[in-house]
Design a protein with these regions (language model features):
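Loop-to-helix element that buttresses phosphate recognition and phosphoryl-transfer chemistry
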Residues: 5-8, 13-67, 140-145
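Active-site metal-binding loops of divalent metal-dependent hydrolases
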Residues: 13, 169, 215
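Phosphate-coordination/substrate-recognition cap region in phosphate-metabolizing enzymes
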Residues: 37-120
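Conserved nucleotide-sugar donor-interacting segment of glycosyltransferase catalytic cores
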Residues: 154, 168
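Surface-exposed cleft-lining segments at the edges of enzyme active sites
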Residues: 129-145
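Short, basic/glycine-rich phosphate-binding loops at helix/coil junctions
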Residues: 13-17, 117-134
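Glycine-rich phosphate-binding loop signature in dinucleotide/nucleotide-binding domains
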Residues: 43-46, 155-160
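Acidic, low-complexity terminal tails and accessory targeting/binding regions
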Residues: 1-5, 82-112, 142, 157-162, ...
């Protein structure tokens, strides 16, 4: 039974979007997470447990946060907190006549290309959620979502006090949808609005978590940090 505390769900810092290796933080991504750690340190935040996915960008985000905050408990890793494979999602959508756009998908290196990329990703995620798009290398959405629910149950039954969870936009959005009881593809819209290093909080109780805040950036509040707000 969980003593009252808060689950802090942190999306990783900015990664190297549109590069050959997205699973690494950019220099700005490192600074975003370090700033969150310093914000936690300034308010005397302590965590009883730390949980992450197994991706490099999760580990790097946690390391940068810890550098700003100081000592943290050893992290427990859950593969269920890893992001869906967006490249596989797009490939599956491009092979599906009902989803594929006319002509090739432009590279997401221009504003129009960026919009086209995320428009198709949004459609692919909705179809995957509905069970109408099979994505090679990815489980069915129901199985993926069940893995996230298992992590939330672990937090409820196996941890005490405040818990830090570092993951990606998809799992955090899916966890939020689970907590507020939003079914279908509601999680997709939440996912595509989550900002890098953003904080989402669930109030923990013996029965179930309750949404306390979503997608906040309390550590990026100065005019000088306005350009630190990123989405990929």
């Amino acid at each position: 039974m969980h003593a009252m505390g808060m689950l802090h769900l942190v999306r990783h810092g900015q990664a190297r979007f549109a590069s050959d290796d997205y699973d690494r933080l950019s220099e700005l991504g490192q600074r975003q997470c370090h700033a969150l750690g310093r914000w936690y340190a300034a308010r005397g935040q302590r965590f009883g447990a730390v949980i992450t996915g197994t991706l490099t960008r999760h580990r790097q985000s946690l390391a940068a946060l810890a550098e700003g905050l100081g000592a943290l408990p050893a992290a427990t890793e859950f593969a269920a907190l890893n992001e869906y494979d967006s490249e596989a999602m797009l490939r599956a959508a491009l092979a599906e006549p009902t989803l594929a756009p006319p002509g090739p998908l432009p590279a997401p290196t221009t504003p129009d290309g960026y919009r086209a990329h995320f428009r198709l990703l949004r459609q692919a995620l909705a179809a995957w959620t509905a069970g109408t798009l099979n994505v090679p290398g990815m489980p069915a959405h129901a199985e993926w979502r069940a893995g996230i629910a298992t992590v939330l149950e672990h937090v409820r039954t196996q941890t005490e006090g405040d818990v830090l969870l570092v993951s990606s936009g998809g799992p955090i959005a899916s966890a939020t949808a689970l907590v507020v009881g939003a079914g279908g593809d509601a999680w997709v819209a939440l996912n595509l609005r989550l900002r890098n290093s953003a904080l989402t909080e669930f109030a923990l109780s013996p029965r179930r978590p309750v949404l306390h805040s979503f997608n906040t950036l309390p550590h990026l509040h100065t005019p000088e940090q306005a350009h630190w707000v990123t989405y990929a």
